[in-house]
Amino acid sequence: GLGDVYKRQVYLASPNFLGGLEDVSAAAEICHAAGAKLIVGANPMALALFKTPGEAGADVCVGDGQPLGMPLSYGGPYVGFMATRTALMRKLPGRIVGQTTDVDGKRAFVLTLQAREQHIRREKAGSNICSNQALCALTAACYLGAVGPEGLREVARQCYDKAHYFADKLASIGLPRREKGPFFHEFATECPGGAEKMLVALEERDI
């Protein structure tokens, strides 16, 4: 079997479906008190501004790497990411790249924990459920290398500031946010006349 670690888990998206940021720390406390693991679905861009799921007590973090320099491309292909605590590391599916040093003392990257893999333990391997998204991962690596830590924070800050500016402007003309809690760069609004009427009005103005 997969073991007890897979039997009780809770998934929490933050930002959630409506764009709101959840209280991951509170969710982690509740889950751990009940003996469950907390998995957080995160936007990688938001992680540049806010406390990470790991810092908030989550056990696993997953997400879509599309915001990291990948065009929309009619829906794909994209790359997903998954991170966990050391205690759960061997439960991860797929190949894991680790950082080490080569014979000259320079930084190097290797495939690590290969005892989990198909060529060694085929019947227990997890990589047979994975697809190869190395090209997308390389795109994300190039993007992150180009913008750097400060650049990534600046992009995230621009996303945050402009979304909040837009939300405030909409509220000033009678279209308030539906949710009142904190959000990152997406939000839902109330449409007093209904969404259909709003769409017609936007179309008439070529918006």
Regions found by a protein language model. Give the residues of each.
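Hydrophobic beta-strand scaffold residues
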Residues: L38-I39, R177
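Active-site C-terminal subdomain of aminotransferase-like
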Residues: L68-I173, R177-K180
